[in-house]
């Protein structure tokens, strides 16, 4: 199995790099969309005491 990054344009998946396949070769495409930044941030979030957060917000005003 090979992972190939593609862009979808005009109803066609187009590879972003040159690939070595014979014309007419068939395969299966699995679409995995890039994660949103909010999903990535959830992985690294930590709990903060509410009073510390309030103090931080006050300093920013």
UniProtKB/Swiss-Prot annotation:
Keyword list, A-Z:
Toxin-antitoxin system
Gene3D superfamilies tied to this protein: AF2212/PG0164-like
Checking Pfam families in the record gives:
AF2212-like
Q: What does this protein do?
A: Possibly the antitoxin component of a type II toxin-antitoxin (TA) system.
- Report the family membership: Belongs to the UPF0165 family.
What this protein is called in its record is Putative antitoxin PYRAB11980
């Amino acid at each position: 199995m090979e992972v190939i990054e593609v862009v979808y344009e005009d109803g066609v998946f187009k590879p972003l790099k040159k690939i070595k396949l014979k014309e007419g070769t068939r395969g299966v495409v699995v679409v995995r969309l890039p994660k949103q930044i909010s999903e990535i941030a959830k992985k690294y979030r930590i709990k903060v005491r509410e009073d510390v957060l309030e103090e931080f917000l006050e300093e920013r005003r």
